[in-house]
């Protein structure tokens, strides 16, 4: 702080730093105390704020806990209300059951009373019958007297008939009333059974509802218990949070105290640093400090050398890894170049052969006639057709090589990635070491700066002392002399540059000649690059067309996939519906089984009841028949008794005999009574027989129903219609399963096809991206070449104008209009250079083994030697041959050179589609059969 303040005041280093007086020191102490109080108050304020925040959070937690307890209280109230409601329902149920028990007890008492009444009535009737029997047995005299009296009256018979008819009518009415009562009794019994079933079902429903209520009540209690557990956990968490808040406040307080201590220490440190600076400036013995600094410097230098050795070792490892990486990159680039050469060399050869053919046509235009051209064209067409097949074979070979190279490239890329990761690790370690080195260098520089500042300060003091003494420095004189010498040297350098510029002007005139040649080469390269760009455009168009086709195929596959998904969905829905039908049929079967079992049990019960009823009716019939036989025997006994009585009761002599009408009336009365009893018994027997017939009919109906029901559960025979329906359903199910499996297989195959198509699509996209990148690179390169050619055009025009002007001047000086020897020499050199370029192109093309074999066969057919790569010695031989050529030019007349034509056929890329053929034919007129003139 003091150094910055002094630098702002522009305080010189030689003067001492001003120190505060006693009053200012007191003010500084007061200011420090106030700052300390301020920091303490700020700490207290922060402590209070933390407490307020903790209390507000605690209040929030308390409010939340209060809400939870309120909700729990409400839940408990609801539970108590539900318990009271269940208690009231149970009390009502208990009262209802008690009322029903009382009603049943009352009904039982009424039934017992009726039973007692009926028993009393039966007992009274039996007593009456016994009394009647006694009267019939013991009151024979009264009856005979009454018969005697009634025999005299004719009207008694009429009254008897009338009473008998009335009795018959009463009997019929009573029988009808009895039948009606029995019908009503049966109906009431049925209603009673229905009511019993309804009450039982209602009771079951009530039991189920009560069970559901109990289950819900248990679940509610469990939920409340969970709620209480969560509240307890939240309370524990709140307690933990409160403890943590207290601990946090305590830690913050400790941190504030430590910060205060740190501030005091920092202030003390700053004061000490200021004092040290002041004391260091006041130190007079600078040599000790310099020696210390030098020792420190030596130590740091030793450390630096050690770190430098470590850095060198790491650099060697880095260089080794980088060399390995470069080797891998070279291999990768070589593989890429081989791939590009394999794909592009054919087009290059075509382009070079086209240029050669064009130039040879210009040279041999005068010699070759129209007929020879026609024959050559026919031969070219024939050979083109032959070479198309060879091209396809070679293209397949190239594709295989390309696939292998791509695999090698992928493996090399993986290796490159691994090496890249290793290099990044070494680089990170290098960065770390470099940072350490920089730190050490920075420290050494600091030490050196301190040393330099001390030396500079000493020099300044010495200079001031010398200036005060009035001495002149010899160094300034030496500086002026050095400046004079430097100015003389600059003058000599200017002269030498002038001579060099003159020599460079001469060289520029010579360079114009070479620029002309390089311009021609640049034109050729430009044409080749334009052809390559056109080929790349064609490749991009083809790849885009294939991409569009792949997209269309993918869309079709997606549509088919969606259709198959819809079919699968429909089949699944049909399957689910069939499964539901099967489940419903199985449920129906189970229900029928249970119903059948219940029905069988009911039939058994009903059958037992019917058997008991039949047994009871048989017993009644037997009793009636026994009573009938007893009555007949009684009638016989009565007849015998009557005969005995008639004999016994003959009147004594002198008394009147009872009339016959008396006995006839008595017999008629007895007969009528017996007839009534017999009619009543016949009615009972006929009624019992009718009931038996009705029961037999119902039994037959039940047996037929049971038989049908049993037959419905029998196995289906092959001759029945149901068996055919079953077979049809099984076949439909089997066909549906097969269709489902086929659809699943088709879906799996389509998914695999889609996956493969996606993979191929990704590969095509990758190739298209690579092609686009290459195209962009080629476009940038072509743009640069165009720019360079446009820049070279004005130079070429200037050079051609200058050459024409020089040619005219030379011809004017020699006073000739014909070509001079120098011009012919230049043309000859151009032709020789042209042949050399062709030979070099052929040599470069023959680096490929397959193309070398093709060249060798064609050159051997025409009796020519293959061109070889020439060394630098060929240039001197060509220069020596030029002088001999010049000497022969004057003696030998110039005749046009005879050109020997070699037809070369190279395999071209196969046509992918008609559109690509037409586009390639329209864009480039490059023939596939090449001619070379030698």
From Swiss-Prot:
Chief place where the protein resides: cytoplasm
Localisation: Cytoplasm, Cytoskeleton, Cilium axoneme
Any one biological process term the GO annotation gives: axonemal dynein complex assembly
Coiled coil spans: 17-133, 164-512, 540-615, 664-826
UniProt keyword annotation of Cytoplasm present: yes
Residues recorded with modification Phosphoserine: 887, 895
Region named Disordered: 866-934
One cellular component term from this protein's GO annotations in UniProt: 9+2 motile cilium
Domain of life assignment: Eukaryota
Positions with biased composition (Low complexity): 873-892, 912-925
UniProt keyword terms in alphabetical order: Cell projection, Cilium, Coiled coil, Cytoplasm, Cytoskeleton, Phosphoprotein
Role description: Required for assembly of dynein regulatory complex (DRC) and inner dynein arm (IDA) complexes, which are responsible for ciliary beat regulation, thereby playing a central role in motility in cilia and flagella. Probably acts together with CCDC40 to form a molecular ruler that determines the 96 nanometer (nm) repeat length and arrangements of components in cilia and flagella. Not required for outer dynein arm complexes assembly.
Family statement drawn from the similarity comment of this UniProt entry: Belongs to the CCDC39 family.
Protein name: Coiled-coil domain-containing protein 39
Organism listed in the record: Rattus norvegicus (Rat)
Gene name in the database record: Ccdc39
